[in-house]
From Swiss-Prot:
One of the Pfam families matching this protein, by short name: SMC_N
Superkingdom classification of source: Bacteria
GO cellular component labels: cytoplasm
Record-given protein name: DNA replication and repair protein RecF
Role: The RecF protein is involved in DNA metabolism; it is required for DNA replication and normal SOS inducibility. RecF binds preferentially to single-stranded, linear DNA. It also seems to bind ATP.
GO biological process, one term: DNA replication
Listed CDD domains: ABC_RecF
Length: 381
């Protein structure tokens, strides 16, 4: 799978673009705050209909514009696809081969993308919200059902929280309605949690292999799901998860009314990374944290290939300078020249020529993008 052409207008500070990409490696060179990250964000948004930087889609519409339009041509083994997504102040709409999609869950998955940014270095020791977002972004693009239940859960959770606030302010008193909302939240939550366990089982295997290959150590990396309802286990089916959630909701009913917010569910769950059984959040060095983060990204590539039969595209946003030669070499070994890769950097010397011997290079300045005629080694393309 690769993205051969990309067009955009009205997205952040980027000038209108119509770019052709190399099927292998594309490098975007420029100083900070010139638009490199915005470009990768735009490509990522075209793929999964969400930003890795903000949950407010309106922020991505350029000042003075009514909408942003992203479009691209995707080449797969069996077919070519034209994708388009438009962000407006009313929402977003998506098309596949000029056919508008009834739901975004029908659109997502036609172009799979893995993005690795400096913020991902915080996955191990950062806030739990970063790890939950990691799961939702990555698992959502490989399974429309996950995306559907995640969207449904967010809507139901907001409704339940709003009603809990009304009860706390004595603006409502219908406990039957609260029971209905609790049942609906537990149903969506159980489906989401069950799928998280399933995907993490495969991700675990690939991440452990990647960690050993990168570090050269015998340390075992494990990724564990930590549900906010401690009674839930990986062996539970959705019906069992739902019942355990309902039991816990009954136990904490008074506390939720007092706090006026939902205390359990996927929005409170977390991931734990362990090295040889020790919590990496507490014990991992900075180098180990970087290796864990890179291992997760490489594991995602393997997982998507396993589930879809296609390599995703890989977006590396200013992270090459964060990786030493060994980690860059490990990255090369895993992508095997089969994964289309987009790299942003302020300095070409930070990128190993063993990884990108003859990339297509673009300069970015003030949102304008032009192609450079020479590769890393100075030879004309």
């Amino acid at each position: 799978m690769y993205l051969s052409r990309f067009k955009q207008s009205g997205f952040r500070n980027l000038a209108p673009l119509n770019l052709e990409f190399d099927p292998h490696v594309n490098v975007f060179l420029g100083e900070n705050a010139q638009g490199k990250t915005n470009l990768l964000e735009a490509i990522y948004f075209l793929a999964i209909s969400r930003s890795h930087r903000t949950s407010n889609d309106r922020e991505m519409i350029a000042f003075g514009q009514d909408f942003a339009s992203l479009a691209g041509r995707v080449h797969k083994r069996q077919l070519d696809l034209d994708l388009r997504i438009v962000i407006s102040k009313k929402g977003k709409s998506a098309w596949v081969n000029r056919v508008e999609q009834a739901r975004l869950s029908k659109y997502v998955g036609h172009l799979n993308a893995i993005l690795f940014s400096p913020e991902d270095m915080e996955l191990v020791k950062g806030a739990p919200s970063l790890r939950r977002r990691f799961m939702d972004l990555e698992f959502g693009q490989i399974n429309p059902e996950y995306l559907y239940f995640a969207s449904q859960y967010r809507q139901l959770l907001q409704q339940r929280n709003n009603y809990l606030k009304q009860l706390a302010r004595r603006q409502a008193s219908d406990q039957v309605l609260l029971g209905v909302l609790t049942e609906q939240v537990a149903t969506a939550a159980s489906e989401l949690i069950w799928r998280r366990y399933r995907y993490l089982a495969d991700l675990n295997r690939y991440a452990a292999e990647a960690y050993r290959a990168i570090s050269g150590q015998r340390e075992e990396l494990r990724v564990l799901y930590r549900p906010s309802a401690k009674e839930i286990t990986a062996a539970d089916q959705p019906a069992q998860i739902k019942q355990k959630l309902l039991d816990r909701f009954a136990e904490i009913a008074d506390d939720e009314l007092r706090r006026a917010t939902t205390q359990l569910g996927p929005h409170r769950d977390d991931l734990e990374f362990q090295l040889d059984g020790k919590n990496a959040h507490l014990f991992a060095s900075q180098g180990q944290q970087r290796t864990i983060a890179l291992s997760l990204k490489l594991a995602e590539i393997q997982l998507i290939k396993q589930l879809t039969g296609e390599e995703p595209i890989l977006l590396l946003d200013d992270v090459m300078s964060e990786l030493d030669q060994n980690r860059q070499a490990a990255l090369l070994n895993f992508i095997h020249g089969q994964t289309q890769t987009f790299i942003t950097t302020t300095d070409l010397d930070s990128i190993s020529q063993e990884i990108v011997k003859q990339p297509r290079i673009f300069y970015i300045h003030s949102g304008q993008i032009i192609e450079k005629e020479e590769g890393l080694n100075g030879r004309r393309r």
